[in-house]
């Protein structure tokens, strides 16, 4: 089964509400939808970045250029079922650009799994679970609004784990915000925070213990991504778990963080690792080092979220669950099928491949004008 064509489309999908982070406020998400055609079948994938190149080194525009001009010409005519060969060829031809590679890798996995009438989870080893506890992100910037949102989520049994974005205000203001939320949800929910690199080491060393005292269970990426030493010291000094996100940008970074046990948990993201196989490798590094895996998100659409669900469903352990909330943050979906959240968990989609199919009318509607 030879690859006949690889096409890319940039779509811009508005969010239901602004998402305030330490570095930007997200009003829309841009994705590159990839379709790989072979043997009468089409596999779909997705690449993107939260807030564009502000968060990382890629954007929808660079992803499309890299695929159209370098990766697609390289892979057309190759065996669509040889996932290892495709991955090696992409890595040899293009340095970095992991989200672009991930989009193709996901599409090839979807294509092969559909051809074999398997789910991607079954293709890569089989499921350890068919649903995953899912955290909701509270990022309106308004304490009362965030509390109302959390209480509604608990009442409707959608979420009982909440991640609060910090770093846009002073640490003292953030702490009061957290205390109010923790008090409001009580023992009905857990609270974690994401600083998105917003603090230096000194600030983090002062405020993380106070967050722990307030009842926070996990602190995500408190310091800049390159400061592995600060992460290690903060992990050693504090009882609350430290989670690496932006620092986890490659298999080699996973090795360095694991070697020094610089963090307690890894936030896995397919786009950060270059695809499914590399994400599984990072999870294996974490397991070997006694570091927990966490199901991270790039605010993926239903396509990327389904792919992540298939990967996370195969992992031995996910003690902190996942945060695959992209489809519910967006104002619309790009697939014919919805994903399901029930009893505080997101459920693995049924069917072959990803278990979701593109809604081509929606894709056309959100396609960026040339």
Curated annotation (Swiss-Prot):
<dbReference type="Pfam" id="PF13378">
    <property type="entry name" value="MR_MLE_C"/>
</dbReference>
<dbReference type="InterPro" id="IPR036849">
    <property type="entry name" value="Enolase-like_C_sf"/>
</dbReference>
<keyword id="KW-0479">Metal-binding</keyword>
<dbReference type="InterPro" id="IPR013342">
    <property type="entry name" value="Mandelate_racemase_C"/>
</dbReference>
<dbReference type="GO" id="GO:0009063">
    <property type="term" value="P:amino acid catabolic process"/>
</dbReference>
<dbReference type="InterPro" id="IPR018110">
    <property type="entry name" value="Mandel_Rmase/mucon_lact_enz_CS"/>
</dbReference>
<keyword id="KW-0464">Manganese</keyword>
<comment type="pathway">
    <text>Aromatic compound metabolism; 3-chlorocatechol degradation.</text>
</comment>
<dbReference type="InterPro" id="IPR029017">
    <property type="entry name" value="Enolase-like_N"/>
</dbReference>
<feature type="binding site">
    <location>
        <position position="194"/>
    </location>
    <ligand>
        <name>Mn(2+)</name>
    </ligand>
</feature>
<dbReference type="InterPro" id="IPR013370">
    <property type="entry name" value="Chloromuconate_cycloisomerase"/>
</dbReference>
<dbReference type="Pfam" id="PF02746">
    <property type="entry name" value="MR_MLE_N"/>
</dbReference>
<dbReference type="GO" id="GO:0046300">
    <property type="term" value="P:2,4-dichlorophenoxyacetic acid catabolic process"/>
</dbReference>
<keyword id="KW-0614">Plasmid</keyword>
<feature type="binding site">
    <location>
        <position position="245"/>
    </location>
    <ligand>
        <name>Mn(2+)</name>
    </ligand>
</feature>
<keyword id="KW-0413">Isomerase</keyword>
<feature type="active site" description="Proton donor">
    <location>
        <position position="323"/>
    </location>
</feature>
<dbReference type="InterPro" id="IPR029065">
    <property type="entry name" value="Enolase_C-like"/>
</dbReference>
<dbReference type="GO" id="GO:0030145">
    <property type="term" value="F:manganese ion binding"/>
</dbReference>
<protein>
    <recommendedName>
        <fullName>Chloromuconate cycloisomerase</fullName>
        <ecNumber>5.5.1.7</ecNumber>
    </recommendedName>
</protein>
<keyword id="KW-0058">Aromatic hydrocarbons catabolism</keyword>
<dbReference type="GO" id="GO:0018849">
    <property type="term" value="F:muconate cycloisomerase activity"/>
</dbReference>
<feature type="active site" description="Proton acceptor">
    <location>
        <position position="165"/>
    </location>
</feature>
<feature type="binding site">
    <location>
        <position position="220"/>
    </location>
    <ligand>
        <name>Mn(2+)</name>
    </ligand>
</feature>
<dbReference type="InterPro" id="IPR013341">
    <property type="entry name" value="Mandelate_racemase_N_dom"/>
</dbReference>
<comment type="similarity">
    <text>Belongs to the mandelate racemase/muconate lactonizing enzyme family.</text>
</comment>
<dbReference type="GO" id="GO:0018850">
    <property type="term" value="F:chloromuconate cycloisomerase activity"/>
</dbReference>
């Amino acid at each position: 089964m030879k690859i006949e064509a690889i096409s890319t489309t940039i779509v811009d999908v508005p969010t239901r509400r602004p998402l305030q982070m330490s570095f930007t406020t997200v009003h829309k998400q841009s994705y590159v939808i990839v379709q790989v055609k072979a043997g009468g079948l089409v596999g779909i994938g997705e690449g993107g970045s939260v807030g564009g190149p502000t968060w990382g080194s890629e954007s929808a525009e660079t992803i499309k250029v890299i695929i159209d001009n370098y990766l697609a010409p390289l892979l057309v005519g190759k065996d669509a079922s040889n996932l290892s060969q495709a991955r090696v060829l992409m890595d040899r031809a293009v340095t970095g650009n992991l989200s672009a590679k991930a989009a193709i890798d996901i599409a090839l996995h979807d294509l092969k799994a559909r051809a074999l009438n398997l789910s991607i989870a079954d293709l890569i080893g089989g499921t350890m679970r068919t649903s995953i506890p899912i955290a909701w992100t509270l990022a309106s910037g308004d304490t009362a609004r965030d509390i109302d949102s959390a209480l509604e989520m608990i009442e409707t049994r959608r979420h009982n784990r909440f991640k609060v974005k910090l770093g846009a205000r002073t640490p003292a203001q953030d702490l009061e915000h957290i205390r109010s939320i923790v008090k409001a949800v009580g023992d009905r929910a857990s609270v974690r925070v994401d600083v998105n690199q917003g603090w230096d080491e000194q600030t983090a060393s002062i405020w993380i213990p106070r967050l722990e005292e307030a009842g926070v269970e996990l602190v995500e990426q408190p310091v800049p991504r390159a400061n592995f030493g600060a992460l290690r010291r903060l992990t050693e000094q504090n009882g609350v778990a430290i989670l690496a996100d932006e620092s986890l940008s490659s298999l080699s970074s996973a090795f360095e963080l694991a070697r020094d046990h610089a963090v307690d948990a890894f936030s896995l993201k397919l786009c950060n690792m270059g695809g499914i196989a590399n994400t599984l490798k990072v999870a294996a590094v974490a397991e070997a080092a006694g570091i927990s895996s966490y199901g991270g998100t790039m605010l993926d659409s239903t396509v990327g979220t389904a792919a992540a669900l298939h990967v996370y469903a195969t992992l031995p352990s996910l003690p902190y669950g996942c945060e695959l909330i992209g489809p519910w943050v967006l104002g619309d979906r790009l697939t014919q099928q919805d994903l399901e959240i029930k009893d505080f968990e997101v459920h693995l989609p049924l069917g072959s491949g990803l278990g979701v199919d593109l809604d081509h009318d929606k894709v056309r509607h959100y396609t960026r004008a040339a």
